[in-house]
UniProtKB/Swiss-Prot annotation:
<dbReference type="Pfam" id="PF04561">
    <property type="entry name" value="RNA_pol_Rpb2_2"/>
</dbReference>
<dbReference type="InterPro" id="IPR014724">
    <property type="entry name" value="RNA_pol_RPB2_OB-fold"/>
</dbReference>
<dbReference type="Pfam" id="PF10385">
    <property type="entry name" value="RNA_pol_Rpb2_45"/>
</dbReference>
<protein>
    <recommendedName>
        <fullName>DNA-directed RNA polymerase subunit beta</fullName>
        <ecNumber>2.7.7.6</ecNumber>
    </recommendedName>
</protein>
<dbReference type="InterPro" id="IPR010243">
    <property type="entry name" value="RNA_pol_bsu_bac"/>
</dbReference>
<keyword id="KW-0804">Transcription</keyword>
<dbReference type="GO" id="GO:0003899">
    <property type="term" value="F:DNA-directed RNA polymerase activity"/>
</dbReference>
<dbReference type="Pfam" id="PF00562">
    <property type="entry name" value="RNA_pol_Rpb2_6"/>
</dbReference>
<dbReference type="InterPro" id="IPR007645">
    <property type="entry name" value="RNA_pol_Rpb2_3"/>
</dbReference>
<feature type="region of interest" description="Disordered">
    <location>
        <begin position="1153"/>
        <end position="1179"/>
    </location>
</feature>
<comment type="subunit">
    <text>The RNAP catalytic core consists of 2 alpha, 1 beta, 1 beta' and 1 omega subunit. When a sigma factor is associated with the core the holoenzyme is formed, which can initiate transcription.</text>
</comment>
<feature type="compositionally biased region" description="Acidic residues">
    <location>
        <begin position="1153"/>
        <end position="1162"/>
    </location>
</feature>
<dbReference type="InterPro" id="IPR015712">
    <property type="entry name" value="DNA-dir_RNA_pol_su2"/>
</dbReference>
<dbReference type="Pfam" id="PF04565">
    <property type="entry name" value="RNA_pol_Rpb2_3"/>
</dbReference>
<dbReference type="InterPro" id="IPR007644">
    <property type="entry name" value="RNA_pol_bsu_protrusion"/>
</dbReference>
<comment type="function">
    <text>DNA-dependent RNA polymerase catalyzes the transcription of DNA into RNA using the four ribonucleoside triphosphates as substrates.</text>
</comment>
<dbReference type="InterPro" id="IPR007642">
    <property type="entry name" value="RNA_pol_Rpb2_2"/>
</dbReference>
Amino acid sequence: MAGKVIQSGRHRQRRTYSRINEVLGLPNLIEIQQKSYQWFLDEGLREMFQDISPIQDFTGNLVLEFIDYSLGEPKYDVDESKERDVTYAAPLRVKVRLLNKETGEVKEQEVFMGDFPLMTETGTFIINGAERVIVSQLVRSPSVYYNTKVDKNGKQTFTATVIPNRGAWLELETDAKDVIYVRIDRTRKIPVTVLLRALGFGSDIEILNLLGEDEYIKNTLEKDNTDSTEKALIEIYERLRPGEPPTVENAKSLLISRFFDPKRYDLASVGRYKMNKKLHLKNRLYNQRLAETLIDTTTGEIFAEAGQMIDRRVLERIVPALEGSIGFIDVRTHGGVLEDEAIHLQSINIFSPIEDGKIIKVIGNGNVDKSFKHITPADIVSAINYFMNLLHSVGSTDDIDHLGNRRLRSVGELLQNQFRIGLSRMERVVRERMSIQDQNQITPQALINIRPVIASLKEFFGSSQLSQFMDQTNPLAELTHKRRLSALGPGGLTRERAGFEVRDVHHSHYGRMCPIETPEGPNIGLINSLSSFARINDYGFIETPRRKVDPETGFVLTDISYLTADEEDVFNVAQANQPLDEDGRFVNDMVICRRKGEILSVPRDKVDFMDVSPKQVVSVATALIPFLENDDANRALMGSNMQRQAVPLLIPQAPFVGTGMEHKAAQDSGVAIVAKHPGQVERVTAREIWIRRYQEIDGRKVAGDLDKYKMHKFIRSNQGTCINQRPIVSTGDWIEKGDIVGDGPSTEKGELALGRNVIVAFMTWEGYNYEDAILLSEKLVKDDVYTSIHIEEYESEARDTKLGPEEITRDIPNVGEDALKNLDERGIIRVGAEIQDGDILVGKVTPKGVTELTAEERLLHAIFGEKAREVRDTSLRVPHGGSGIIVDVKVFTRENGDELPPGVNQLVRVYIAQKRKISVGDKMAGRHGNKGVIARIMAEEDMPFLPDGSPVEIVLNPLGVPSRMNIGQVLETHLGMAAKLLGIHVATPVFDGARQAEVFETLAEAGLDRDGKTILFDGRTGEPFDRRVTVGCVYMLKLAHLVDDKIHARSTGPYSLVTQQPLGGKAQFGGQRFGEMEVWALEAYGAAYTLQEILTVKSDDVVGRVKTYEAIVKGENVPEPGVPESFKVLIKELQSLGMDVKILSGDEQEIEMREMEDEDEGNGEKLNLVLEGGSLNEE
């Protein structure tokens, strides 16, 4: 027997074909959401309050400080918030201190700052009763970037850009004449020396001393027509603020506010880290030749001689000195922007790699302290110097698409940015109120207006592009949605502008972003998925785990290092499937490694790291595809995406051929019930599980608290699928922490179960499986194999109208008792009733306009006080295709204290469940991108059958395999058949699964032919087919594209107001468009009357269509068509342009256009046809 048996969760064993012992288990898969939000609650909020605190008024007399904050308890729990359509949130209270400097008076108060949405345990938010997910955003990291392009003369030019988190951009560029220019915040370019003079390097000599004698600088100085700091400041001011009178003071304050004011310019900690890393000397001296001797000033020790090449060993020796003392200079400036502060730089001379003997200055920014979140003059000087070094081939340009230069903004940071907007608006209000109100009576509460804060949060959760309605089709869809990375959204890219490079797979994605899972269509490559082992570091960069290789001994250690993309670029990384001996050494002398984007073969003592697992490359959804290594990438992409669309079935079944990921995916998705503490099961019902905790005290087990886990029963998901949990433990079972005790939708025995295992034959059958169509056995319908439950929600509200309140009642005018048989005394349908299209769900009447009463009615009214009830029926009815069984009714009223929108007195929600069996036109798919539509459901006895007499359940077309190159499905077919016959479940992990030989061996073990083929017999004749056929067991999914949701038919219905043509689409109950090409077809056949009918009475001849309807109902002949409405519209259009247009007949007589006559309108109303753009039966 090949493979070994492993435990997949508590309830199932699988035989795995894996050969690699994984040293690291999978992390918590929704950690990216939870960690980020936790950071926000613990630190993000505090940072925000520190940023705006203290707020002072314009005189500096009143000071408002934020001291501390706390979150209270939420008003409703998660389930109740969903039920009541409210936001799951907790009140945020902030401790505020107001100081009056004149009187020395201090007032402290706790101020309520609005309800703050909380994250649920599963990483979602509940906003107005709907579950939403905040998707992480991939953006360019703030830093300094260098780029190169070739101009039209074939000359290489460079550009540099300093990108902050928020604030003005600073760009450097060269032109054809070798002059260096700078742009401040996308304005016109000025010579870079003007900016240097403004920083305080007034004279040419100072600039040349600072940057070295360089021809580029000399060219720039020639171009520069300023000669002092003052002139430079005025020049810059005129560029940034044209038309305003320039003064030196204004210019200084403008530059300070643009770049050196922390409130206006923010690099964020990540920007400071990236900037220091890029400009630090240790990265810039690597592989360069020194032009000076490096000596330790304190001890006189020589680190490196002049003329020495700095390789990695020398670099490691001098790094501590670079951090400490070598090369530091303080430059004094005069009259610059920051007055006379010294600029702290670090400078070392090297030889030019391209011109012999030329000395180049390398200037670092002197390791600016991490607390400086704004740019400093040292940064600017150092960035300009790096740019000049590039012109002499020292340094490197940056790749924007490298994941070392793109970072993630997760929930916490996105929320923080939004909260910052709200707080800054609030700060403005506070300042205004401080100056207006009486300073003695003032309190913190009176100053603070929390409206802008609440509004900005509401806006973010309600309408931001990154706050999305959770995809809840199945557990995998939920999980993937929380791990999604989007490059779109505010501050990101747009679909139209994103080019090819951004979307492409990059070598730095390895182990960080999945190269497979991304949508097809306009968003391809812009929306990605996090790889299975990846995590996010404090700066927002994606890290992936690696096993360290000990450089001395060559042992692969079990301790794990997490590396970001730019850290990894300098190392040789071996694959996870490199064979190791018992001690953990590489078996082979030469090991295949990756370094940047290249695949190299290196000696085993040169390997730095090794992958932890073969599946660390791919995302969770892709890691669920068995034999992924045998599939073409395009089809694997479809497979990953279609697993997310699988509908939860009535009776789910885990796959016989899995990848070993099924348990982890189910556990972390949040749909299964996971034990929080170890203990023993005390009670199990369909609705709850009780587990008694036990603690060990002095070696004895002592009973502790009781944990109660409630099951969700038949609840509607966001996508209308059914959420239903059921227990899978029995009374008396011992439970460990993390065990799955209850299955949710699409899980079975604690494993993800998106579809069913079915017997499939690959053969053609009478053309019924031509072009990917699927032939199905009726047995799958009879046995409810692919039956799913769908729940739809309908609501009706009783409002206050101008003519009086609407009323929910059983007493509806002109409705017979038969139609009311399922309503209770309130007029609301009872739970459990079976209903058809058009049945009443909630009886409701609305007052009609008051009419003049006749004398008799007035008399009756005077005697009985009862006016003839003037109401019309506005009941909620079941729409087309909505029939099913009522599973739940919820009634909310003002009297019960429910929060309802203004003007609404009563709200009724009705939930209808439908059992949908699989039917012709439904879409099905395997896990390898092999999708198709059901073409025919055939009687079981007519299906081809196996030698033992059992019929196959599905017949697929073998032509769907070779051209698509997804051979994984064939291997799955073989292995699945063997597993079914052996009665086992198998696991074949991605890139480390069963080899071809092992599949054949398992087939033989099960007593099947090694080629997996068998003789099949025709079910209709009993004759064997000519050739042996591949038959096996495949895991097939039923996808959310169900024919019941798409099928649609219309007789009459709503018409568009202007053109009077039928509306389009199922949602509007529209008609089918008879388009240009269809008209040509009728013309080609010469079907004149059919064509006339289609263009007139079936479309927009208003009078004609009413008459036609009447004629059909009365059984008369259909009348002559009139003039179509759209023709009248055309004439009106021409008349509106001032043309006199008439219609003439063949003998030049003017034709009067017949308008709708009164009698016709009456007829239309009789026939229940609404002509004025309203819809049928709408009122």
